[in-house]
Curated annotation (Swiss-Prot):
One of its GO terms (molecular function) is D-mannose binding. The chain crosses the membrane at residues 55-75. Residues 1-54 are cytoplasmic. Residues 112-227 form the C-type lectin domain. This is CD209 antigen-like protein D. The gene is Cd209d. It comes from Mus musculus (Mouse). Keywords: Calcium, Disulfide bond, Endocytosis, Glycoprotein, Lectin, Mannose-binding, Membrane, Metal-binding, Receptor, Signal-anchor, Transmembrane, Transmembrane helix. Residues 76-237 are extracellular. Its main location: membrane. InterPro entries: C-type_lectin-like, C-type_lectin-like/link_sf, C-type_lectin/snaclec_domain, C-type_lectin_CS, CD209-like_CTLD, CTDL_fold.
Length: 237
């Protein structure tokens, strides 16, 4: 084969549409130089062949570095144990508040205090009718069992006005009993107002009056308080 024929065989023909400028050098010139020096027909092929182990290692390093950065960012957003405990306490407090708001230990118009429900009347009746009204509500005219309860009821009644309690001596003068038949505890006699009970005018029923107790005619019309034990599980958390 002649030298001219061999030269034509080795010559690479590059289409005109591949001729473009890259950093001031024509694409065709670069392709020709690659073909002459390395026997590569195009720049794309050169790019593929340039993927040596060093390049792959560099790419792997960059990938791992990026992954580590993402992990660090995610870990930094996780709350510390102290913050988690604070969040837990706030959630428990919120739960308790929601529980209290949704769970009612007493029926509507009744007031809860120390495990019992109290109904404070808005109307006035005599002592006997007040006792009957409480029974119709499934309760009793209030029986006082503790000093805390006495303080609570006395303060509430003082703001409302004279109020009946479930205490009388109608069956035996000067011997006071509650509506359930139990006797008045001697420790509670200190709650009588000074000079009371005096039984003036056949006063056989007890009322909350001012800062203490007073005996009064059972026919008088007063407010009244009913009491019953709360049976709701809401009373305990």
């Amino acid at each position: 084969m002649s030298d001219s024929m061999e030269s034509k065989t080795q010559q690479v023909v590059i289409p005109e549409d591949e001729e473009c400028l890259m950093s001031g050098t024509r694409y065709s010139d670069i392709s020709s130089r690659l073909q002459t020096k390395f026997g590569i027909k195009s720049l794309a092929e050169y790019t593929k062949q340039s993927r040596n182990p060093l390049v792959l290692q560099l790419l792997s390093f960059l990938f791992l570095a990026g992954l580590l950065l993402i992990i660090l960012i995610l870990v930094s957003k996780v709350p510390s144990s102290e913050v988690q405990n604070k969040i837990y306490q706030e959630l428990m407090q919120l739960k308790a508040e929601v529980h209290d708001g949704l769970c009612q230990p007493c029926a509507r118009d009744w007031t809860f205090f120390n495990g019992s429900c109290y109904f404070f009347s808005k109307s006035q009746r005599n002592w006997h009718n007040s006792t009957t009204a409480c029974q119709e509500l499934g309760a009793q005219l209030v029986i006082i069992e503790t000093d805390e309860e006495q303080t609570f009821l006395q303060q509430t009644s003082k703001a409302r006005g004279p109020t009946w309690m479930g205490l009388s001596d109608m069956h035996n003068e000067a011997t006071w009993h509650w509506v359930d038949g139990s006797p008045l505890s001697p420790s509670f006699t200190r709650y009588w107002n000074r000079g009371e009970p005096n039984n003036v005018g056949d006063e056989d029923c007890a009322e909350f009056s001012g800062d203490g107790w007073n005996d009064l005619s059972c026919d008088k019309l007063l407010f009244w308080i009913c009491k019953k034990v709360s049976t709701s599980s809401c009373t305990t958390k």
